[in-house]
Amino acid sequence: MFKNQPKGLYVLALANTGERFGYYTMLAIFLLFLQAKFGFDSAVSGQIYAGFLALVYFMPMIGGWLADKWSFSKCVVTGVIVMFIGYLVMALPTGIRSTGSLAILLGALALISIGTGLFKGNLQVMVGDLYNDPKYSSMRDSAFSIFYMAINIGAMFAPMTATAMTNIAMGAQDLVYNGQLPSLCNQYLDSIQAGAANAEIGAQITAIASEAGMLVSDVTDFATNYIETLSTGYSYGFGV
């Protein structure tokens, strides 16, 4: 597949695989993370998700402009570093349902979008530049096929990796993921903050948890621990 291709293609394709793996791992769990950790409904979560994607697709315009004034390679390297910092910040477990944690998250998303803008389009230009040499010009189309295949390889393993990291974190606390529990736990904690625990929701949490083999001795403690553990698992997924 790489036979007779310039050696730089190996490096650029591998970088593309790694970047897309991290990006799609994050996207696979991002909405669930927002809803679990902060108790956002689907509308608010969707707005944050859409805003992030808008930045991701807008920033390459800035990245291309900077590359013309700086250089493609410097933009790519800087983009990798900025993205790494952004993912590292997202991987750090912070308090659930707090304004401070949300501010940290939004800062991390800004870093990731900026890094992606510096990295993504400029990496493709670097691939194309490898084939300006007449020796390799006839292989340009096959090179980009390999390059885009690298995207799919990274994306293919992302969802299962995110799920595995979440399950590891949950299993360490003898918890099991259930799609209903994050919302119910947040609703119950909201009712506590409002001054009166919602007994009906508490009963639902207890029933679902018991059916899954989880022990609930105190609903408030269980709900808090469940959200904290699930959020930590998602954070681990961001750091992969």
Residue ranges and their predicted role:
Residues L106, N178-N186, S231-V240:
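Symmetry-related core transmembrane helices of the 12-TM Major Facilitator Superfamily/SLC fold
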Residues T17, G86, G100-N122:
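Hydrophobic core of transmembrane alpha-helices in multi-pass small-molecule transporters
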Residues Q47-D68, F84, M156-F157:
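Central cavity-lining transmembrane alpha-helices of secondary-active solute carriers
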Residues T78-G100, L105:
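C-terminal ends and interior cores of transmembrane alpha-helices
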Residues M26-I48, N167:
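Short amphipathic helix-loop junctions that connect adjacent transmembrane helices
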Residues D68-M83, S138:
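Cytoplasmic membrane-interface "Motif A"-like loop-to-helix N-cap segments
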Residues V56, D141-N167, G213-V216, V240:
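Glycine-rich segments within core transmembrane alpha-helices of 12-TM secondary carriers
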